[in-house]
Amino acid sequence: MDIILKASIPKLREKLLEALQAVLPIVAIVLVLCFSIAPVSPSILLCFLLGAAMIIVGIMFFTLGAEMSMSPMGERVGAMLTKSRSVPLIIGVGFLLGFLITISEPDLQVLANQVPSIPNMTLILSVAAGVGLFLVVAFLRMLLGIALPKLLVVFYGLIFVLAAFVPKEFLSVAFDSGGVTTGPITVPFIMALGVGVAAIRSDRHAADDSFGLVALCSIGPILAVLILGIAFQASDSTYVPPILPNVSDSVELWHLFHEGLPTYIKEIATSLLPIIAMFGVFQLAALKLDRRTLGRIGVGLAYTYIGLVLFLAGANIGFMPAGNYLGQVLAGQSFRWLLVPIGMLIGYFIVKAEPAVYVLNKQVEEVTDGAISASTMGAALSAGVSLSVGLAMVRVLTGISILWFLIPGYAFAIGISFVVPKLYTAIAFDAGGVASGPMTATFLLPFAQGACEALGGNIVTDAFGVVAMVAMTPLITVQLMGLMAQLKQRRARQAQPVSAAALAFADLPDDAIIEL
């Protein structure tokens, strides 16, 4: 154990540098706004800065912890299920994994509180069942080799048909649920399951099919909330803004965070326990990993736990009030149109601080053998989230229905999926669920809510939906990146000189070449 801890110290330093590069640009933007056009109280600013420090340390521990624990656990379980060749086992375990992981996701509790007309436990169980069902669909797709775009057409078609019958109060929350429930605990494990399943296959499409699990799992919550929206009558939901901190000195500031920490200590423990318990069953029944491997996974789980506690405490206590207040101040100015470019700027950088984005970018780089680098993926995600936040701010200012953005957006994303390389499509639809994580829920959503409140808009219909917009645009930007890469490769092949022998064979049919 001591050897594992010592070996992880250099990696922690590396992760700290990555975390600083991700969070400091957001801090710089907020500080510039606070000292120029959007003044805030010292209390809010101090909470924001302490929250930022906790987020940096949290990202450092989480990213290394996920690499050491969540990824190898998921890969080994996925590989074991595939080796079993038992469809009933894959269906049963797949559903149970999806259900248990989702039911303990902290962000799902937040979502349930935002829909007062549906009992909390009814919503939580329905969404968890939706994720479990679609994790089974994702497994079967990989094993049967079904093309992802075909399933996306069917299921998103069903979603938009149901949306026509759902009260408008449910629409934004329903589409937000798809991004909220694929959080920092769910994503690393589910993505690793995909890699494990694909690793057992030896065909040339195995790498393509290692992605797409998060994409399909994001559909389950949307369908669940839409169906519940039809079954339950919409009620007048009362928006409760976050309580703005009011601390007069450093001791009160520490007490504010110290009092909030036990909540996240308990939440993250509850979230990780089902995954640990399921892995323990697999370890005893089939995996039989050696003590050194288990020790490494144990240290990784400890890092993951510490990282998520610090991250969520910093985001909820420090970032959420700051985001809400900044939105109010900017929308209350005569130059409220600045919400759009400022929102785009914040969106561009904030996705870099999403914990699960690190896991996605690293896995993409590994599976593609560096053909798609982590920096390229990061740029595509940043561009997508920047665009989505800009469009979300347009909605806040104008009150336009979210369907005017989602229907053409998803139609375009699914349409180009039939001409884009399969790998890019699967990565793109996974990226949508990954990008819309806790940073979106704790800063961008409160930012939109604060702006909407200052403008006197309908927060339920106009401010909610930011998560859905953030989940949609990466589908387009990542696929466009793939399309450009495909065109670049085609031009490179066309530019290569062709030998006379190759030209002679080019005009012959395939069977003639085989006979020769």
Predicted regions and their residues:
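Transmembrane helical segments that form the transport core of multi-pass membrane transport proteins
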Residues: 243-356
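Helix-loop-helix junctions within the multi-pass membrane cores of secondary transporters/permeases
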Residues: 78-80, 87-158, 336-417
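Transmembrane helix-loop junctions in multi-pass membrane proteins
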Residues: 32-46, 66-74, 100-115, 134-146, ...
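Intrinsically disordered, low-complexity non-transmembrane regions of multi-pass membrane transporters
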Residues: 1-19, 23, 74-88, 202-213, ...
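Interfacial loop-to-helix junctions that mark the boundaries of transmembrane helices
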Residues: 13-19, 40-50, 82, 115-124, ...
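Juxtamembrane and boundary regions of transmembrane helices in multi-pass small-molecule transporters
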Residues: 2, 138-153, 169, 173, ...
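Alpha-helical transmembrane segments and their helix-start/interface "positive-inside/aromatic belt" motifs
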Residues: 14-22, 46-52, 80-88, 148-153, ...
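Hydrophobic core segments of alpha-helical transmembrane domains in multi-pass membrane transport
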Residues: 24-37, 51-61, 93-100, 130-141, ...
